[in-house]
Curated annotation (Swiss-Prot):
Organism: Escherichia coli O6:H1 (strain CFT073 / ATCC 700928 / UPEC)
Transmembrane segments: none
Subcellular locations according to the entry: Cell outer membrane
Quaternary structure (record): Monomer.
Leader sequence residues: 1-21
GO BP term, example: lipoprotein localization to outer membrane
Gene name per UniProt: lolB
UniProt name for this protein: Outer-membrane lipoprotein LolB
Lipid attachment points (S-diacylglycerol cysteine): 22
Function comment: Plays a critical role in the incorporation of lipoproteins in the outer membrane after they are released by the LolA protein.
């Protein structure tokens, strides 16, 4: 089904978010050089992951709307992933399944949409301009196409600045989950002008 030109999905707001505690380290002290071998090794370790999944809390805040939801992100192979957003009652508000050249999205009424661009699809259907193509790397603690970034004292990403298509995103990492190897982001915040996206990961399962 072709995409409509209007906002279709409005996610139910959550009054409160309950997060599962995990072992988190926060950035401390001066950052390390992006040219360091430790950073190159960390990137390689993350890229070597074939499958991973994480769940947690999602918030989108702008002058136009405020959305709070739970999310589940599962990567099953290269360029194959699944994203769920659920409301306070646990019902699915949005399910997105992506593979090379084909993206399918099902809304909370069971309506199915198809496209070849997940980022564009979510933006049109929800009114939230989420940089999904870049977020797939950022959520792993990788800079993606960004070249302007900083590391913390543990040779992990602490901040990213990235401009594309008129958007100027700044990504700040608030800590890492050290229960996984390699350590994975535990919370992060994306900002562009008056809009903010917050993600808090309860846990990671990596393979």
């Amino acid at each position: 089904m072709p995409l409509p030109d209007f906002r279709f999905i409005r996610l139910l707001p959550l009054a409160a978010l309950v997060l599962t505690a995990c072992s988190i380290t926060t950035p401390k002290g001066p950052g390390k050089s992006p040219d360091s071998p430790q950073w190159r090794q960390h990137q390689q370790d993350v890229r070597n992951l074939n499958q991973y999944q994480t769940r947690g809390a999602f918030a989108y805040i702008s002058d136009q709307q405020k959305v709070y939801a739970r999310f589940f992100w599962q990567q099953t192979g290269q360029d194959r992933y699944r994203l769920l957003l659920t409301n306070p009652l646990g019902s699915t508000e949005l399910e997105l399944n992506a593979q090379p050249g084909n993206v399918q999205l099902v809304d909370n009424k069971g309506q199915r949409y198809t496209s070849d661009d997940a980022e564009e699809m979510i933006g049109k259907l929800t009114g939230m301009p989420i940089p999904l193509n870049s977020l797939r790397q950022w959520i792993l603690g990788l800079p993606g196409d960004a070249t302007d970034y900083k590391l913390d004292d543990q040779y992990r990403l602490s901040e990213i600045t990235y401009s594309q298509n008129g958007k100027n995103w700044k990504v700040v990492y608030g800590g890492y989950d050290t229960k996984t190897q390699p350590a994975m982001p535990a919370n992060m915040e994306l900002t562009d002008g008056g809009q903010r996206i917050k993600l808090k990961m309860d846990n990671w399962i990596v393979k």
